[in-house]
Curated annotation (Swiss-Prot):
Annotated catalytic residues: 39 (proton acceptor), 233 (proton donor)
Role noted for this protein: Endo-1,5-alpha-L-arabinanase involved in degradation of pectin. Its preferred substrate is linear 1,5-alpha-L-arabinan.
Residues covered by region (Disordered): 202-227
Compartments (UniProt record): Secreted
CDD domains assigned: GH43_AnAbnA-like (cd18831)
Annotated Gene3D superfamilies: Glycosyl hydrolase domain, family 43
Enzyme class: hydrolase
Protein name: Probable arabinan endo-1,5-alpha-L-arabinosidase B
Top-rank lineage group of the source organism: Eukaryota
């Protein structure tokens, strides 16, 4: 028994050492949960926690607390999305908010590596399954209504998040290509307002211009970017006075081969910039604008966490909590086994830091 335990310990140490880290191993351990989920959004409503993630018709999970136990209770949509493009059965990267008693679930439909995409919205009077109405697309890129207008003619319209300031909504979205953008929502929160001129705000862009042969060779112009891959997506904006914080998922999100992982620091990680305006410009600690490739690394691979991303922030009695999906370094199985984790946030000189649990 001692020999088995020793061999297991040696195996564990060896495996964990083989997983590259972009954050120090001294980083506080993630608060792990039993929920397997990809690109989560978490809300607290009606005395319970709800998590929405990628899956058949946008799966809904419920728990008495953020730590769980979590159980799947149904889905947002009762059939495929009414948007006629992309993976209509399994919409991506949902984000759910509540405004004046109505719940809005924004979601993406697309195909991997292409920007023929759309963001849709469904509404309900309850955060749980049943009673949701799918209103279809509110913005599109690649093809479809409005896709030839700025900024949709240069973006990939996926990964929605919504910032609410007063009675106004701001749709934040984007992945690769020209990066992250923000446009105003109308009062109904189910349609987009005027996006011309200064109403469309460019928030972030990845500086990398790596060329990928498979992308260059793709005959579909909507599935290649002649300037190279720019891996930034999954944006989210939170507020902690006096700053707005733009959170980004930075680096390679998917298709991890445990025998050929990307170089350390090129896998998913969570970065942030701040601004006194909800529209930016957002800068990192060095004052570099996120549209120029800036971004402060807040949480990356460490300890048993590999490639955290798909993040959001939820505020509880003890303060702000950063939640995300991550892959487990131990017994690495890749993104298909990603689970929900969370970390407590503190603020030092106006910058968020990961801290120990209170």
């Amino acid at each position: 028994m001692v020999l088995v335990a020793t061999l297991f310990s040696l195996f564990t140490v060896s495996l964990c050492r083989s997983i590259p880290r972009s954050s120090p191993s001294s980083s506080p351990y993630t608060q792990a949960t039993d929920l397997k989920i990809h690109d989560p959004t978490v809300i607290n409503a009606n005395g319970a926690y709800y998590a929405y993630g990628v899956g058949e018709h946008i799966v809904i999970h419920q728990a008495p607390g953020l730590a769980g136990p979590w159980k799947q209770i149904g889905s947002v949509l009762d059939k495929d999305s009414i948007i006629p493009k992309g993976d209509r059965a399994k919409p991506w990267a949902p984000t759910t908010i509540e405004v004046k008693g109505t719940f809005y679930c924004y979601y993406s439909v697309s195909n991997a590596g292409c920007r023929d995409s759309a963001i849709g919205v469904a509404t309900s009077q309850s955060p749980g399954p049943g009673g949701w109405t799918d209103h279809g697309a509110i913005v599109q890129s690649g093809t479809g209504q409005g896709s030839d207008e700025h900024p949709f003619n240069e973006v990939n319209a996926i990964d929605p998040a919504v910032l609410v300031t007063g009675d106004k909504g701001h749709l934040v979205f984007g992945s690769y290509w020209s990066g992250i953008w923000q446009v105003p929502l109308n009062e109904d929160f189910s349609s987009v307002g005027n996006t011309t001129g200064l109403n469309a705000h460019h928030l972030a862009k990845h500086p990398k211009t790596e060329r990928v042969n498979s992308q260059d060779q793709n005959p579909d112009p909507l599935c290649r970017d002649s300037s190279g891959r720019r891996p930034v997506e999954g944006a989210y904006i939170s507020y902690h006075a006096p700053y707005y914080y733009l959170w980004l998922s930075w680096g390679q999100c998917c298709d991890y081969d445990p025998n050929n992982l990307p170089p350390s620091g090129e896998e998913y990680s969570i970065r942030v910039g701040r601004s006194e305006s909800p529209h930016g410009p957002f800068v990192d600690k060095q004052g570099k604008e996120l549209t120029q490739g800036g971004g402060e690394l807040i949480y990356g691979s460490n300890n048993d966490v590999y490639a955290p991303g798909g993040q959001g922030v939820i505020t509880v009695e003890t303060g702000d909590i950063l939640y995300y999906h991550y892959c487990e370094s131990l017994f690495f199985r890749g993104l298909s086994e990603a689970r929900l984790g969370y970390s407590y946030l503190g603020y030092v000189d106006g910058w968020p830091v990961i801290r120990e649990a209170p």
